[in-house]
Amino acid sequence: MRIGTGIDVHQFAEGRKLIVGGVEIPHSKGLKGHSDADVLLHAISDALLGAAALGDIGKHFPDTSPQFKDIDSMILLQHVGKLIAEEGYAIGNIDSVLVMEKPKVAPHIMAMRGNIAACLDIDVSKVAVKATTTEKLGYVGREEGVAAHAICLIEERKQ
């Protein structure tokens, strides 16, 4: 049994879609990034890669590569899931938290969980997504950006 953690932060930017957990959320701003900047999927990807000692998201999908420009992070997460399986691991569970003031994401959490589970070919009961604010403190409180934290458990696949 192995545990991994992941953290990601993205700044808000004009003229971008806000995509979190593979869900497009109506908002006046999106997140700045080389890919679609899905902060939640990036944190989960890092947690999974870390648990398997496979490096981090930047190693596998460098932001200097045109191949990953504006790529859907669901594709990246699906690739991470395949890497985990190829290393002989199965995902036990994923727990994650979004840290953002606005917009409220509670109405979208079930869709996010479903997207993550489908992408990784695991049961949705193994995926938790929560959301919180910073009570108006710091860059999140000033609505300058969004953070996501994730932790996961992976286990050796039974032969």
Swiss-Prot record:
4-CDP-2-C-methyl-D-erythritol 2-phosphate binds at residues 8-10, 34-35, 56-58, 132-135, 142. It comes from the Bacteria. SUPFAM superfamilies: IpsF-like. CDD domains: MECDP_synthase. Keywords: Isoprene biosynthesis, Lyase, Metal-binding. Its cofactor is a divalent metal cation. Homotrimer. HAMAP family: IspF. This is 2-C-methyl-D-erythritol 2,4-cyclodiphosphate synthase. It comes from Chlorobium phaeobacteroides (strain BS1). The lineage of its organism: Bacteria, Pseudomonadati, Chlorobiota, Chlorobiia, Chlorobiales.
